[in-house]
Amino acid sequence: MDIALAIKALILGIVEGLTEFLPISSTGHLILAGQLLDFNDEKGKIFEIVIQFGAILAVCWEFRHKIIDVIKGLPNDPRQQRFAINVIVATIPAITLALIFGKAIKAHLFNPIVVASAFILGGFVILWAEWRERHRGETHDPRANALLEAAKAGAPRIETLDDLRISDAIKVGFAQCFALIPGTSRSGSTIIGGLLFGLSRKVATEFSFFLAIPVIFGATVYELYKSRALLSADDLSIFAVGFVAAFISAFFCVRWLLKFIATHDFRGFAWYRIIFGIIVLATAYTHLIAWQA
């Protein structure tokens, strides 16, 4: 095994695992890291699919009991049937647009300038969404009981995954479509979209995790099938390094995020996106780093 290549695979696997489920865009980070490490050829793109699969398996393991309950309940449990339907209908919009526009998006938008711009814009959207969330319960009606009105208006409408309606799932599904733009963040689009549509922070985050399973699994199977002619046995060791690194880092990241959202909002991630995006644009326009278009 080429040690230098293995180190690159390890770094990219960790980057994928740490960014896939945070609202900071794993695709954007992989595009930038891939260019910095000179690991962005056709094999590198296949490698990205493999490590994304490693990350999604970490989510499957973390939520294995819920997944098993859904599978067991599909024949006769209305709650599990409704949950499965919600995941399916929320997945359809993004998959449909990806099939129609996927090639054009990869050809024209997968570059550092677009990624950095999406980082910055997405950061401001998160700040706005969090501001809206904090002020959700405010009322300016002097005739109303302020405390009562704030309690009614400020509480999220959906506190558990079982409360999620098909209409809510469809809205989150359309929000996920924004993630087709690299640098936007699939988890960021679905979590922030969920908050705006009345989901609690916990429900929005967990539903985002579950939405990732069919989306990333489907993309993995599709891309590996398309690129099967480029794969060889020599790639297995490098792919395995990245896969394991992505699985382990994603597993700990998911557990950390579930604890984090209990007491924190996403403003820190928003400022990270904005600052990082500005740095990337600055390095591009000053030619400090020769980013590829």
Curated annotation (Swiss-Prot):
The keyword Membrane applies. Disulfide bonds: none annotated. The keyword ATP-binding does not apply. It holds the Pfam family BacA. One of its GO terms (biological process) is regulation of cell shape. One of its GO terms (cellular component) is plasma membrane. It is a multi-pass membrane protein. It catalyses: di-trans,octa-cis-undecaprenyl diphosphate + H2O = di-trans,octa-cis-undecaprenyl phosphate + phosphate + H(+). The chain crosses the membrane at residues 3-23, 43-63, 85-105, 109-129, 203-223, 238-258, 269-289. Its main location: membrane. GO terms for molecular function: undecaprenyl-diphosphatase activity. Its EC number is 3.6.1.27. Belongs to the UppP family. This is Undecaprenyl-diphosphatase. The lineage of its organism: Bacteria, Pseudomonadati, Pseudomonadota, Betaproteobacteria, Burkholderiales. The gene is uppP.
